């Protein structure tokens, strides 16, 4: 599933609780809104594959006024330990159309191939494998783990409005790398 959180006029004026109805979804909503320097934008991508006991969630936030980003990818499963890649303070002087950034131990890009139809997400990073889920909320110490994503999200359904933007059902295909494990993914998101 793809989620794009687009602040409404009410959120800009009154905080995060919308007081106006959700606006219609436009193709431009899938892309950064460069003309609005005060926006904090978010993109989320998720998937679940019962076949591989693997779910994933990627979240990228960009604050145009501070030129900082926040990034997290989590890989989980019923019989898997949590793998976490997180950087809460990424300096991004100029956000590219590919939503790409590099920081210490991480490179990621989020390419909108066709608005509201097709996204490509790439990640090469070092994350950590956590011993317990609670470690994700604490010091996030764990075993250093190589993580890679080369995934495509393709539209199954039309996007649906939400209180904070929109979401959309997609098919998700590609590769997930966790250290030496290579997972050929064909999932829903």
Each PLM stretch: what is its role?
Residues 1-189:
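Targeting-peptide/extracellular-domain and disordered-appendage signature
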């Amino acid at each position: 599933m793809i989620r794009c959180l687009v602040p409404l006029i009410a959120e800009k004026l009154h905080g995060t609780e919308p007081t106006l109805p959700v606006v219609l979804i436009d193709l431009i909503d899938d892309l950064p809104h460069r003309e609005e320097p005060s926006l904090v934008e978010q993109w989320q991508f998720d998937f679940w594959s019962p076949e591989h006991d693997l779910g994933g969630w990627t979240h990228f936030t960009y604050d145009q006024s501070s030129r900082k980003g926040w990034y997290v990818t989590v890989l989980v499963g019923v019989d898997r330990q949590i793998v976490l890649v997180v950087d809460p303070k990424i300096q991004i002087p100029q956000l590219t159309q590919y939503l790409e950034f590099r920081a210490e131990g991480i490179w990621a890009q989020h390419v909108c191939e066709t608005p509201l139809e097709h996204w490509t997400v790439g990640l090469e990073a070092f994350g950590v494998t956590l011993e317990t889920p609670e470690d994700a909320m604490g010091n996030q110490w764990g075993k250093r783990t190589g993580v890679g994503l080369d995934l495509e999200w393709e539209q199954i359904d039309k996007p649906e409005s939400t209180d904070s933007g929109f979401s959309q059902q997609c098919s998700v295909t590609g590769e997930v790398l966790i250290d030496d494990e290579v997972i050929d993914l064909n999932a829903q998101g």
